[in-house]
């Protein structure tokens, strides 16, 4: 008999999640309800292929959809026209220098078909805490001193779990994603989790993985040694124009 109700989480942030395979089929991927956004619970969730997604006024909802949307770090789609534009682009790229601004911009960016944002104040505080602990990271795109794009997510071991991205100017989010993918590919990290598909992600080269395959990949990657910490020095400052010649597809 299939389950029709999600698992109710214990108040203890150290309590385990149920196996992701027990997630509901309708709504797709809903696994658990309740709990909190304590860093221990969040990191445990991501390490098992689970993420929080809820709106203001809703209880905390935890998901593991099937299939899972991912990006291969060597397969971000940049059109020939976009690459030509990149060659003369004067924007610069940095990491972990404006995390709070990136997550705030993602929260305030309108999304087609969405009324309001799921990046609530509660969510922002939780990910700022993970950032201070060295687990949540951002890649930022600057036009001079102005932030024009960015992406943020969570890194555990050698697996990056993307959360959201934004464009403050045309192409800003695409450049942030491509820059993140190029850096991770160079480090040998093969995938970026993109959670749930939408048309924009698919145009950028996102792919669908069966949940079982995704969970196997996550288990392998999060177990690889990679200490938490700031990415600012590790990433350095780069020029967006350098992405024009990076082979990602």
From Swiss-Prot:
Keyword Zinc belongs to the record: no
Annotated region (Disordered), positions in chain: 1-21
Entries under Gene3D superfamilies matching the protein: Leucyl/phenylalanyl-tRNA-protein transferase, C-terminal domain, Leucyl/phenylalanyl-tRNA-protein transferase, N-terminal domain
Protein name: Leucyl/phenylalanyl-tRNA--protein transferase
EC number: 2.3.2.6
Keyword Transferase: yes
Localisation: Cytoplasm
SUPFAM superfamilies: Acyl-CoA N-acyltransferases (Nat) (SSF55729)
Keywords, alphabetical: Acyltransferase, Cytoplasm, Transferase
